[in-house]
């Protein structure tokens, strides 16, 4: 079935949710097998061949950010240039791996469904990839490009645009919408479809900064990737928010200390990662007041999947794998965090709709029939 006039649509990916490319001209390398210089850009994310033992040392060194406490900004190591390919196109968010291996399939199912309904890739459905290692305060050029693209798409389509965001992309979208005047939003945004949003932050990020997280890839040591994961400012930005979670909830337990949302400064000191607290202070205010977006919101979230909500560490804290305390959610985003969008009900004149997706895992919800059917309903509605 073809649509008469397509509602232009932008896909905003989440953390790790689009390709990154790198070009090297480094003064030194961490291992003799690492490339020191490349003639052109190559895929840094996602390239599974770079994530094998030994090669991962090179990957970590190229992927990491260096935080500058004076400028409150982060940058790549000397001789490493990172770029985000495919802004305004869909390929970079459809497949994270350019070889289109199924392991890296991301927005493909949604985009392909839209093509089947009469959409055209890179025309009335486009991707808005960004450097997801950073928080919005360091991606100002991205938001200017996003605003310009939305305006162009709306003018061409003859009506406002729908934004479909996943995971951390929802916080990016919220930040973006909070920066726009209401008149702009009324003119250019029809709906904001939110998939698997970590509105109140996620407990999982605590494990990432404390002991690293290999995402269940057995050949990768969590401690080996920890330095890179800590350096990504967006990781610290996604720690649980004090205005969303109970103040007395213990997220991290060691033989000597319990850490709640009010104890993050001490936590950063105890794991010897003082820069992390500075990053948190830089980024926590960006969306912490949870100002309503001022557009129609459709908040789809997974539930019924075991999701980490606290961690217990032995006396070897922080250099040891924790015992995981499980709760409800989508396997990544805690249910408590996902439903925070209900706080907007009645706080903006535009409708806020919540849809629970039982047994839906965080990334799998992008290929779920219910999700795709819901998107179709929104795009088809007048």
Specify the residue positions occupied by each region the protein language model found.
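N-terminal non-catalytic accessory region
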Residues: 1-164, 168-229, 239-240, 246-255, ...
């Amino acid at each position: 079935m073809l649509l008469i006039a397509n509602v232009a649509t932008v896909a905003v990916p989440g953390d790790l949710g689009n390709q990154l490319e790198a070009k090297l001209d480094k003064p030194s390398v961490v291992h003799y097998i690492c490339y020191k210089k490349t003639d052109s850009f190559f895929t840094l994310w996602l390239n599974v061949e770079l994530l094998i033992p030994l090669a991962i040392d090179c990957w970590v060194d190229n992927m990491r950010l260096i935080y500058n406490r004076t400028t409150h900004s982060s940058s790549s190591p000397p001789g490493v240039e990172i770029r985000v390919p495919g802004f305004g196109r869909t390929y970079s968010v459809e497949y994270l791996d350019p070889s289109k291996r199924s392991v890296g399939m991301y927005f493909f199912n949604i985009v392909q469904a839209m093509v089947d309904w009469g959409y055209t890739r890179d025309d009335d459905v486009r991707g808005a990839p960004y450097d997801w290692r950073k928080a919005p305060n360091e991606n100002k050029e991205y938001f200017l490009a996003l605003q310009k693209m939305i305006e162009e798409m709306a003018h061409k389509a003859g009506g406002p645009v729908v934004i479909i965001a996943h995971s951390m992309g929802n916080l990016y979208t919220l930040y973006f919408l909070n920066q726009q005047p209401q008149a702009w939003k009324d003119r250019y945004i029809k709906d904001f479809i939110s998939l698997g949003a970590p509105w109140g932050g996620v407990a999982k990020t605590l494990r990432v900064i404390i002991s690293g997280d290999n995402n269940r890839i057995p050949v990768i040591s969590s401690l080996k990737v920890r330095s890179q994961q800590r350096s990504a400012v967006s990781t610290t930005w996604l720690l649980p928010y004090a205005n969303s979670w109970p103040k007395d909830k213990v997220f991290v337990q060691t033989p000597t200390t319990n850490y709640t949302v009010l104890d993050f400064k001490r936590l950063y000191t105890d794991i010897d990662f003082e820069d992390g607290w500075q990053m948190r202070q830089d980024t926590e205010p960006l969306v912490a007041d949870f100002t309503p977006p001022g557009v129609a919101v459709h908040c789809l979230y997974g539930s019924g999947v075991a999701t980490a909500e606290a961690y217990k560490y032995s006396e070897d804290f922080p250099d040891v794998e924790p015992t995981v305390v499980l709760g409800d959610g989508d396997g990544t985003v805690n249910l408590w965090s996902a439903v925070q969008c209900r706080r907007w009900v009645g706080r903006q004149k535009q409708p806020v709709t919540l849809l629970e997706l039982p047994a839906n895992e965080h990334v799998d919800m992008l290929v779920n029939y219910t999700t795709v059917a819901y998107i179709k309903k929104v795009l088809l509605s007048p």
